[in-house]
């Protein structure tokens, strides 16, 4: 899928507005150097067939990569492990990644490698779906209004089903896409908030099912509906269009979106090897500029979203029916068949500082890794911040973003004035507030999960 005529409209970079960087609390050192031509003009970027690969697709289809002097090849990957491995071994220059992947790799959970990110690709975008059988057992216990279930639906209701199955000796199984995926942590968060233990990772149980009430396993996103239809799993957490696909096929019902679990949660990032970023700083900034522009374009109008849906429906990208993709991408979400509700924030690509890599977002993922045993021992608050600063690169983001401000492509007000931390965040389904500066205090608030010196 290499773009033809890639030499068209190549542009040199300009420096950003240093005063804005200072106001944002970002070091000026990284911003003072004027980026030059890309060190590497021909690059290959990987993605998984999900609607939130949209910034990559839009940057390619709208010519934003070309504008930055890049000849980009986009390549779909079979699953998240293959994608990560190919970035690590250099077959891919960078990729659409789960927000937890650079962090997990850096701390050595699974494959050990130094992966960094300077760009968040989107906020929200996932949902939890259950099979028709499970939905039929849950529905009688739901509060109703106007003949429809009251949302958000909490896992307390699912617990009744799981407890009944447990008495019958039947295991309850659900799918998620990868051990360090947002989906894994969101599903675990929702289950635990409803009194269900989603299990722990241990040295002898790397599947994460120790002491579990609900058995979670990995299934690639496009295979989720078929795996549930076959009865291998009874529900799953995944990105779009694979929840809406279950509705379209009549095999399942989404019960909650991740926006209802954690408001404005960061979902995917653009990840590269740390060595690659050091060797190709101008190329890295060029990619970031193109993707920031793509995010801005995606959130600029409904007409743009509709155009993006058509792009994503192509076989080389998501390859799903445009109507199914459009359900969530254009601000609605269908739960039970015919129960279509407004969901204007289901996919956010630029608003709410969606592209900025906040340290506090990184630390939240690390707290969940500790909560479920992927981090096996107690760590001081300073450790969480040190890892976040090693992996998340807001100063590189600001260099790219300020260049776009100087070029008149985005506004200075589109960028946050921040030291890398959001304020205390509420909007979680269990009512627990999160302060990224106090990760251990945050962990202490949960009834289910490891904290302090706990071990499984």
Regions found by a protein language model. Give the residues of each.
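N-terminal secretory signal peptides and thylakoid transit peptides that target proteins
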Residues: 2-21
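Conserved C-terminal helix/tail region of periplasmic/extracytoplasmic solute-binding proteins
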Residues: 363-456
